[in-house]
Design a protein with these regions (language model features):
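Catalytic nucleophile loop
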Residues: 1-8
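Amide-donor transfer/coupling interface in amidating biosynthetic enzymes
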Residues: 9-155
């Protein structure tokens, strides 16, 4: 969520962009999920558990998982506000993972970055020492590749 807010403020120029969880704003790029808006007693009403996500073919996330259909665990009430999706995508932040039932954005990537993936879900919830999240493995691999490239260039 913070990556989306930062991008909105400093790339899209929406200086007051924020999450409606933090403050009321003219640009709630992260907003309360529609099904949560009528709920006044919030206890026990979060989006909890595993939900499906369809990854875009050719995305870094799809490459990391090695498949297009995944299921990851959630714990939240706030989501990317799809009213801003066209602006984000035109500026280079792509929604590359979407819930097929609700059209909620689950995964974002920066198109011209060696490895920038943001998720709405919590990949750490299903990750273990013996079976780490594919995103964690992909991130470490990308960092190692980057370090190796830098070492070769600086010799």
């Amino acid at each position: 969520q913070c990556a989306v807010i930062e991008f909105a403020r400093h790339v899209l120029g929406l200086a007051d962009a924020n999450s409606s969880e933090m403050e009321q704003t003219a640009h709630p790029v992260i907003d309360l999920m529609e099904e949560q808006k009528g709920i006044t007693a919030k206890g026990g009403t979060m989006r909890l558990g595993a939900y499906p996500c369809v990854l875009h073919k050719g995305s870094k996330a799809a490459e990391a998982y090695g498949k297009l259909h995944i299921s990851e665990r959630h714990r939240h009430r706030y989501e990317f506000n799809n009213d801003y999706l066209a602006q984000f995508e035109a500026a280079g932040m792509k929604a590359v993972g979407v819930n097929p039932d609700t059209n909620l954005v689950e995964v974002i990537e920066l198109e011209n970055h060696p490895w920038f993936i943001g998720t709405q879900y919590h990949p750490e919830y299903k990750s273990t020492m013996l079976s780490p999240s594919p995103l964690f493995v992909s991130f470490v691999r990308a960092a190692l590749d980057y370090a190796e490239k830098e070492q070769k260039q600086n010799k």
